[in-house]
From Swiss-Prot:
Disruption phenotype: Knockout mice exhibit memory deficits. It comes from Mus musculus. Homodimer. Heterodimer with a RAR molecule. Binds DNA preferentially as a RAR/RXR heterodimer. Interacts with RARA. InterPro entries: NHR-like_dom_sf, Nuc_recep-AF1, Nucl_hrmn_rcpt_lig-bd, Nuclear_hormone_rcpt_NR2, Nuclear_hrmn_rcpt, Retinoid-X_rcpt/HNF4, Znf_hrmn_rcpt, Znf_NHR/GATA. PANTHER family: NUCLEAR HORMONE RECEPTOR. Residues 16-53, 211-232 are annotated as: Disordered. Composed of three domains: a modulating N-terminal domain, a DNA-binding domain and a C-terminal ligand-binding domain. Receptor for retinoic acid. Retinoic acid receptors bind as heterodimers to their target response elements in response to their ligands, all-trans or 9-cis retinoic acid, and regulate gene expression in various biological processes. The RAR/RXR heterodimers bind to the retinoic acid response elements (RARE) composed of tandem 5'-AGGTCA-3' sites known as DR1-DR5. The high affinity ligand for RXRs is 9-cis retinoic acid. Acetylated by EP300. This is Retinoic acid receptor RXR-gamma. The gene is Rxrg. Residues 211-222 have a biased composition (Basic and acidic residues).
């Protein structure tokens, strides 16, 4: 297309070669321009000398003069694949900057020709740093700082709340002046009529408030339905029945055979706990869905929580006792006896963190049963075959207890939280009791696993 290019043109002396040096090279046309008479369609090609061939990375091309991002791209790419090393005697070093003024001077972005595959300057998406792009929205009603778009208009929290209250309560305002009051950040509360009218003029939508209220109502109804479903699946009535079924008979407290009792409070407590283990299994069988679990999981749950379950029971039973605890056998263990037996510190914790708190809030039997059921359904017990099922049952008890407290004690909105706060104390005291061998005679020489397994396999005895 360019005729016969059998020779390459001469390089001028200023490029490091010897004067008049002539060399025939194998450099590609992208690096060196050939000589010879061009075709008529390319009149710009002449036999006059032109500047020496240069690689892209060797000269101050418009790309390199622009800096980031092109400099990063070209430096990462390296020299073009078509650029070859100069032959011996030719030094392809960039000429002084004075010789590149024509190359480096760029009058506009249109003069810049990017590399193939790279976008032009006009097409580059640079982050906007103009002052206008950093301006935050202001409230369209009063000019205060906007907290976002509310009911279709950028507005502050004050105007948002004012508009919502007006719509929800269907309020009607009047203006004392000419219905043209100035509404700005300082005077927005002076005239409610003009403020409301400006909300409407600026585009706030009444229907947006009504739709928001409808969504809130639907969400509340949905949550209520879910909670109701949980309550039906874990009725508090059955939990209360389980507590009442295993409650020691009050009249039996006075019939305790004194000859069988000892002066050692630890022995008395262990004896009472041994008796209570049988009723503990009966109680667990009456808790909804406990018997639906595998026999192995039932054993694991009782083994993990028996100490906390028994401590919760005698603590609640002792709320009417002065400075002591009442055992299921009818015996009273006083603080002085516990201190003399060397278990005073843990005994004091039971009285302070459990008995006293239960007494102050007047915890009833239903709440006690729910707390014990939460302890029973422990998904963290080691060895469970289906922890997720146990966790689901615990969550159902949570929902049942919360609904019960809201319905039974509406004047105490924090009661549910107060009840749950007793669980960490119960857990800590239970672990401390084991650490001190508080119930060291509980099972004697019988391993607890086989002991509980034998009781669980016994049919439920209705009393």
């Amino acid at each position: 297309m360019y005729g016969n290019y059998s020779h390459f043109m001469k390089f001028p002396t200023g490029f490091g070669g010897s004067p008049g040096h002539t060399g025939s090279t194998s450099m590609s046309p992208s690096v060196a321009l050939p000589t010879g008479k061009p075709m008529d369609s390319h009149p710009s090609y002449t036999d006059t000398p032109v500047s020496a061939p240069r690689t892209l990375s060797a000269v101050g091309t418009p790309l390199n003069a622009l800096g980031s991002p092109y400099r990063v791209i070209t430096s990462a790419m390296g020299p073009p694949s078509g650029a070859l090393a100069a032959p011996p005697g030719i030094n392809l070093v960039a000429p002084p900057s004075s010789q590149l003024n024509v190359v480096n001077s760029v009058s506009s972005s249109e003069d810049i020709k990017p590399l193939p595959g790279l976008p032009g300057i006009g097409n580059m998406n640079y982050p906007s740093t103009s002052p206008g792009s950093l301006v935050k929205h202001i409230c369209a009603i009063c000019g205060d700082r906007s907290s976002g778009k509310h009911y279709g208009v950028y507005s502050c929290e004050g105007c948002k709340g004012f508009f919502k209250r007006t719509i929800r309560k269907d309020l009607i305002y009047t203006c004392r002046d000419n219905k043209d009051c100035l509404i700005d950040k300082r005077q927005r509360n002076r005239c409610q009529y003009c403020r409301y009218q400006k909300c409407l003029v600026m585009g706030m939508k009444r229907e947006a408030v009504q739709e928001e209220r409808q969504r809130s109502r639907e969400r509340a109804e949905s949550e209520a339905e879910c909670a109701s479903s949980s309550h039906e699946d874990m009725p508090v009535e059955r939990i209360l029945e389980a507590e009442l079924a295993v409650e020691p008979k009050t009249e039996s407290y006075g019939d305790m055979n004194v000859e069988n009792s000892t002066n050692d409070p630890v022995t008395n407590i262990c004896h009472a706990a041994d008796k209570q283990l049988f009723t503990l299994v009966e109680w667990a069988k009456r808790i909804p869905h406990f018997s639906d679990l595998t026999l192995e999981d039932q054993v694991i749950l009782l083994r993990a929580g028996w100490n906390e379950l028994l401590i919760a029971s005698f603590s609640h039973r002792s709320v009417s006792v002065q400075d002591g605890i009442l055992l299921a056998t009818g015996l009273h263990v006083h603080r002085s006896s516990a201190h003399s037996a060397g278990v005073g510190s843990i005994f004091d914790r039971v009285l302070t963190e459990l008995v006293s708190k239960m007494k102050d809030m007047q915890m009833d039997k239903s709440e006690l049963g729910c707390l014990r059921a939460i302890v029973l359904f422990n998904p963290d017990a080691k060895g469970l075959s289906n922890p997720s099922e146990v966790e689901t049952l615990r969550e159902k008890v949570y929902a049942t207890l919360e609904a019960y407290t809201k319905q039974k004690y509406p004047e105490q909105p924090g009661r549910f939280a107060k009840l749950l706060l007793r669980l960490p104390a119960l857990r800590s005291i239970g672990l401390k009791c084991l650490e001190h061998l508080f119930f060291f005679k509980l099972i004697g020489d019988t391993p607890i696993d086989s002991f509980l397994m034998e009781m669980l396999e016994t049919p439920l005895q209705i009393t």
